[in-house]
Amino acid sequence: MKNDNNNQQQKYKKLSLSVAIAAIGTVNVAYALQEMTDTELSTIEAQDGLYVNAEYDSATIGRVYWQDKAGQSDNTETTLGMYFDGVSLTKTGATHSTSASHTGNLHTTINLDIGSSGASTGVALQSSAYFGTLKADSLKICDSTGATCGDSYGSFAVQSQEDIVFNLTTQNGLFNKNALMNVDLGLKNLNFYLTQQAAGAINNQFIVRNFNFNFTGKGYIYVGDSTETNPSYQNALVLETRDAANYIDLNKVEDVDYAGKFNAGLNIDMVYKGNTGTTLSTKDPMNPVKGVLRLGASGRATNASLVVKGVDASTILGAAYDVGGVTAGTGVGGSLAGSQGLYMRVRADFTKHDDSLGGEESTLELAHGGTNAYGVEFSNLTPLLIRTSTDLADPAKPLNTARAYFDTGDVYFNLINSKKVQLPVNDTLNNSRLTIGSTTGNITTNADYLHLVHDGTTSNPNALAVAVRGFNFNAIARTTKFISSSDVTGVDIPTNPAQNWGLGLPFYNLNANMITYGTTVSGSERLGFALGLSTEGRNTTGDKTTSIILIDGADNPLDSNNATNYYIGLRNIDMLITAYGTLGLENNKINLNMPKLTIAAAMELAGGYLPGSRYRSIFTGCSAANEIACYAPVDSFTKKDDVFLGVKLKLDGSMNLDIVPGVDTLAGNALSFVGNYDLKGAGGDYTASTIQLVDPIDGSIIGFDNITGNIGFNNKIKINKDTIAFSYGFTFNPDKAPDKVFRVRDINLYPATGNGQRLGEMVMTGGRLDTNMTFKPRN
């Protein structure tokens, strides 16, 4: 082969290919290859691996879609598709690139080496990609041909500000179940945009800015077969750490705009931007984004796993119903989820400050979104039990060494067509007595768990369903500190050290259905949705719970200065929430209009010591001979000793809710919830609303029954430099309408035995109730 440049002396140990690719490698399209010159071919030697560098200016793809099978009420299965139309890739200019020559150029780089020790073959893969802005003009759910579609969700875009990095190293094969593998995945500083067009051709955006999912890990990647003892692993792609020595590190990421400042390894920063035109930007000083909420997680986790697979003939969502909501399908053809679907499950154990396994301890962050934002970092994550029964039986009374954890349970993704969807029944609520006047029943019935997707009468919308079954989050944060966004400087930066107070938001056996579809209301693009969500209050032994509790971790001198672990809050929350309606980005707010919102719950207002804690005082019976009496029982969440009162409620009506983002200043960045809840009363599609307070000793009840009327609300949460402020405002009958007067038609007393007695009623024709609370934690 002729070499016109006489450069044969410059040989490479790797194969170097120069190609022009018409689309990013993750998109299932054809690639156009540029013809290689003799000069380029002369550099090929391929002795030591494969090196591919692909650069391109832009790409246009007509349609990208995912198809799924869906059952129907007539027992015939159909095919539905989720279609991204008008897909394009364009430059936006990378800020951080693995190669200076790549800055601003769309590119994919792959470096693959394969080596052998004689007994095994190892693989080393290093790759990076920069795709600029990946945009789809619309997202619709369509029939099998893609010709008949529902309304658009809006337009979607993903914007990369630096390279995506994926590295993998293994010493024995690629999907070897018993071969340890090192993995790096760097999704850093991505921006996600949902753009909806409101009436008047005004574009508004919901944005996840500076998204990070940046981790390194040691573990195993393989495809499980039908012999796996864990059912979720069967016929699935499995990533797991498996052994105690292996781990996942969520590493913090340098802020793309503020050198030397870092955001969480998993960073979900949600903001709102109104009247955007056609621009995709989070850095417009003339139209800054407004913060909504930021969630973050960093640090080392262990006992982690990720499972992904396809599932067949799932009955997880129940039967498909016709538009009348009467006729239900049967068999696979009538199963709402159909014969195909996607499945995922993720779990991990958190580490804490004295058990970090050589890495950084796990931390969680909750903050206002955007810039000029304060937040709170939670750490020292532990289970609910301070000591187990085994620990208390030990003369040394050691602390519980088990780790806090989360487990998403089974998560299913399906395209569906149905009037109703099924949620698993909460037996506690179904068996919890709820007496209203002379009518005795239960808080919920089986019918409450078959909830509506929509209230239309002509046809069911084709929709995306995400179903969660058995999500557990068994973690209590025992240490907390205030934090701020990267742009905050000087005296505005929180300086307080980590403090011994915490927040417990554990939940047990959470089940949920989330249904979404595109729709149009009064000329505005909106998101149709239906929600069903339930939690279980506790398990039988009381070591898992759904609760909202504050923790005081002051030193206990009677327990070697371990934390005292006082708590107060709502515990053992059995809850069911169902709703349907539409969501839109309008008028600088996120609006949810729900024609029907039902909330049913049973819970306890309680305060005391966390299970297994050493009492701070010497109680009767506590002695050296009877040390067990010096500790809170490990099953104390199954007892009534800490309970001030029980609460039962069922509220049913319509709600219009505005989630109002804060303005881009330290003083103004807050999150507000503004709207009204119209309690309808029994009749038609609605049931009676009631709130009942239960005596924990004898079970007698005072009931505020048959509640009707309209309640307006304006509530705000504001995290400051060293305080957390809550503002609540309730307006009764805000429209001053005679038929919307707030009324408790019956105030009843229900003794533990015997018949209930009506005490009277309460009517509020108008008025306002305001409450402001500010918490300033101190050690």
Describe the predicted segments one by one.
Residues 43, 48-779:
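N-terminal low-complexity, acidic/Ser/Thr/Gly/Pro-rich segments
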Residues 1-35, 44:
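Gram-negative bacterial Sec-dependent N-terminal signal peptides
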Residues 37-39:
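General structural concept
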